[in-house]
């Protein structure tokens, strides 16, 4: 059982015994003081020690000092003429203060435990293949280059490449998505995924400490070091607020009695009010609940595959006015696919068949898209004399016919009269024996949720969405139009993108922020320059995790909407706590100043407000994406 809880229980029993003695035996005041000091010290010796330590180090004004002064003052008030002893009240105040502290520690521990459970993605053991035998060892003892075996139902312990086996991986702990990902030999796997079906043999590429799972856990746990504006405000507020409260309490204790008939009698009344004032003025609810709100928000976001590197970025996300997207790999897949087939005198299937066979040995992205669209090359077709002509295309003999696949220059070189295409994309022309046979349009495939993501941002009041791309003007503008982007800048070099970003930062509204969303590979300068740098699709990408302020672990632009929604709700809960705590405290402080609040009421108000604020803060752990 918790030591503090035992002290509280023992202190409560001793307080009851002391109260019983006080009401059954007539003892001098100093003897009753000694009796009540026993439960007081059992319950509050650490508070007294912290108060004295703070005084010795020059850090006088904190909650321990306020409680020490208020309770010792209540103990001593009974020695004033015509004053009633307040021993029981003093011990009870300390008892309740410690109960509040206990609840605070419990709530924080539970929050951290919940986050650790959510991020429990590192297995304690792994199966490593050594000397032809499978050994179960701790993952941190496995070196780069060794081979591990991942059985169905087990979690991948280290990042690596599959050298044997086929399976499906559950990546929900990393990406927040429940759809399994199919993997086979040659694919990369990252630690934290759960193997669903087949046995996988994986060659380790990163040590345990450098694995994706370890970096994610470290990032979430260290996120609290970067304080939000609200946290920084509360820290400054407490430093100024507490000394002011002590000064007001001193004035309240000693100035009003000067204007009363009997100074000593009035001093007793006003001193009690001042001590009550001190008890209720303790800023625990604010100091505890605000950081807990942001910590919970960061943990809650991690459940959805969103890693926020600090509470300050929750502030920045909630104040976004402009979101800038890189096109390739962010709004589009970065992979070509066939958009249209326009044959001339032959069938569409035959046109695609010829293009795919001519390009069958090429690794160019356009060639890959043609082969994927055709799907089946094992049809007995004879392909000979394949020649790649730089800057033009590929020429080959297919079943005795010379087939050219390439751009307009290729068609001009063989005398084929080609046609322009109205479909936006890269046009691949085809000729057969010098006669034009048609063209195929390939384009970078837009992500399925890109349009929904932009619509979601607009619905949240983000007034400016911008896309940056190095693509041709017509290609970039077509993508922007299809997804609903407000502004598009095309034909940009990497250095140009940073210049555009600087212009947008200069134009943004005051007290609003700008986010840049990229794939984290070539966007490090832009990610660093934006108010919030967001790396998308960073599963297994060290560069993205290091460079960005916010990391979206999968490839869905809609996760940006989720990140902003969670940030705004987290900030809303933190603000609720601020206004609730300040409102209740101001009310009870006023009641204490005019003598309408007792010390019992004050401690109930202080601890009660803290408990409610902490419970409200813990809601951030379960924020949904909707």
Where would I find each of the regions flagged by the language model?
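Conserved ATP-binding TGD loop and adjacent catalytic N/P-domain core of P-type ATPases
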Residues: 400, 432-576
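Membrane-embedded transport module
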Residues: 508-511, 548, 553-626
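Juxtamembrane helix-loop transition segments at the membrane interface in multi-pass membrane proteins
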Residues: 52-61, 103-117, 292-311, 618-626
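Conserved catalytic phosphorylation-site environment of P-type ATPases
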Residues: 63-68, 174, 272, 282-358, ...
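P-type ATPase nucleotide-binding
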Residues: 338-464, 473, 482-501
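Actuator/coupling domain of P-type ATPases
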Residues: 19-22, 36-125, 129, 141-148, ...
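Bilayer-spanning, highly hydrophobic alpha-helical transmembrane segments
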Residues: 12-13, 232-261, 274-294, 575-604
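N-terminal membrane topogenic signal
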Residues: 1-12, 241
């Amino acid at each position: 059982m918790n030591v503090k809880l035992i002290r509280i229980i023992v202190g409560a029993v001793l307080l009851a015994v002391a109260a019983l003695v006080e009401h059954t035996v007539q003892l001098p005041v100093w003897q009753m003081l000694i009796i009540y000091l026993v439960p007081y010290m059992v319950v509050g010796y650490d508070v007294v020690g912290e108060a004295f330590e703070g005084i010795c180090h020059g850090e006088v004004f904190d909650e321990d000092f306020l409680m020490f002064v208020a309770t010792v003052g209540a103990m001593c008030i009974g020695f004033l003429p015509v004053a009633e002893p307040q021993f029981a009240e003093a011990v009870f105040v300390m008892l309740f203060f410690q109960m509040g502290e206990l609840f605070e520690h419990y709530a924080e521990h539970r929050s951290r435990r919940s986050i650790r459970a959510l991020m429990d993605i590192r297995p304690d053991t792994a199966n490593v293949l050594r000397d032809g035998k499978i050994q179960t060892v701790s993952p941190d003892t496995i070196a780069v280059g060794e081979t591990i075996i991942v059985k169905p139902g087990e979690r991948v312990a280290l990042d690596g490449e599959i050298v044997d086996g086929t399976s499906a991986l559950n990546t929900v702990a990393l990406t927040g998505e429940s759809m399994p990902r199919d993997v086979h030999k040659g694919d990369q796997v990252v630690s934290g995924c759960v193997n669903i079906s087949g046995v996988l043999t994986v060659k380790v590429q990163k040590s345990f400490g450098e694995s994706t799972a370890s970096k994610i856990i470290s990032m979430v746990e260290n996120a609290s070091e970067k304080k939000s504006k609200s946290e920084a405000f509360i820290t400054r507020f407490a430093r100024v607020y507490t000394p002011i409260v002590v000064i007001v309490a001193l004035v309240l204790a000693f100035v009003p009695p000067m204007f009363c008939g009997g100074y000593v009698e009035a001093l007793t009344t006003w001193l009690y009010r001042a001590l009550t004032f001190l008890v209720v003025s303790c800023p625990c609810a604010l100091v505890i609940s605000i950081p807990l709100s942001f910590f919970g928000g960061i943990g809650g976001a991690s459940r959805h595959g969103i890693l926020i590197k600090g509470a300050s970025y929750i502030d920045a996300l909630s104040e976004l006015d402009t979101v800038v997207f890189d096109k390739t790999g962010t709004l589009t897949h970065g992979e070509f696919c066939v958009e249209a087939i326009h044959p001339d005198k032959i069938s569409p299937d035959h046109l695609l068949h010829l293009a795919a066979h001519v390009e069958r040995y090429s690794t160019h992205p356009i060639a890959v898209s043609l082969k994927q669209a055709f799907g089946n090359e094992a049809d007995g077709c004879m392909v000979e004399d394949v020649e790649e002509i730089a800057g033009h295309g590929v020429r080959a003999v297919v079943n005795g016919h010379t087939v050219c696949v390439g751009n307009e220059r290729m068609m001009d070189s063989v005398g084929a009269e080609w046609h322009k295409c109205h479909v936006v994309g890269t046009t691949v022309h085809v000729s057969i024996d010098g006669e034009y046979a048609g063209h195929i349009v390939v384009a970078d495939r837009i992500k399925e949720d890109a349009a929904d993501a932009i619509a979601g941002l607009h619905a949240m009041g983000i007034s400016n969405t911008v896309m940056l791309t190095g693509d041709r003007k017509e290609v970039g503008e077509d993508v922007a139009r299809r997804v609903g982007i407000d502004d598009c800048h095309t034909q940009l070099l990497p250095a140009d993108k940073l210049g555009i970003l600087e212009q947008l930062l200069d134009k943004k509204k005051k007290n609003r922020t700008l986010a840049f969303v990229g794939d984290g590979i070539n966007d490090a300068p832009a990610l660093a320059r934006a108010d919030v740098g967001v790396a998308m699709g960073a599963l297994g990408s060290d560069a993205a995790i290091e460079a960005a302020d916010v990391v979206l672990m999968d490839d869905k632009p809609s996760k940006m909407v989720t990140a902003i929604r969670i940030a705004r709700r987290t900030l809303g809960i933190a603000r609720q706590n601020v206004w609730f705590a300040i409102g209740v405290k101001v009310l009870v402080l006023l009641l204490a100043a005019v003598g309408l609040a007792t010390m019992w009421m004050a401690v109930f108000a202080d601890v009660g407000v803290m408990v409610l604020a902490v419970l409200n803060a813990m809601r951030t752990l379960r924020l949904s994406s909707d």
